[in-house]
Amino acid sequence: MTWSEIILATLKDNQVRLVAYVPDNILTPLLKAAAADDDFVTVGAAREDEAVGTVAGAYMAGLRGAAMMQTSGFALIGNALASLVVPYQLPAIQIISERGTMGEFNIGQTLVARTMRPMLDALGIMHHTLADLATLRFILDRSIKQAFTTQAPVAVILSPLLTGGNPAASAQLISPEGPRA
C-alpha cells in the first residue's frame, strides 16, 4: 500500500469521516482518494484555520474529522488552536505535509518549517513525524486513538522521506552546475 492508502485506511479504522483541507500538491493523492470514497465527506477550505474550525465544529456535532494542510499553512492556525481547540479540549487531528526541509528552495517554507514543532510544543499539542511506511499505520493509529481518548489535539507531520516531497520544489533547486534553464 502507498502512504496515502495507509493513511486513508487508518482514518477509516478510527471512524474519522470528515476531511477538511486546503489543496496541496503533496496531499493530492490522499485528498483525491478521500473525495472518491463514500465513507468520507471532504470539505475544501480557503484557509487552514478554517479547516481546523470545520473539524472542531464537526466534532462538537458528533463527527470525527481531520484537517489536512501544508507546513506553510500551519502558520495560519495558531489562533484556532490556542483559542478553540486546546482550551476546549477538542481532539482535532491535523495531517501536515512537510516542506521547508531537505533542499527546499523557498525561504518562506524553511522559516515556517523551523517554527512548526516549537509552536506545537508551546501549545502542548502532541506531534509525531511520519517518515516511513513501516511505522506509518502504527504511529497514526495510536495518535488518533490518543487524541480521542484524551480529548486533545494531535498533529502528524508527513516527512518528505515518506511522501517523496514536492516535485515542483525539487525542480527549483540549483545544482552545482548552476540554475536550470
Task: Label each PLM-derived region with a short phrase.
Residues 1-181:
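Thiamine diphosphate
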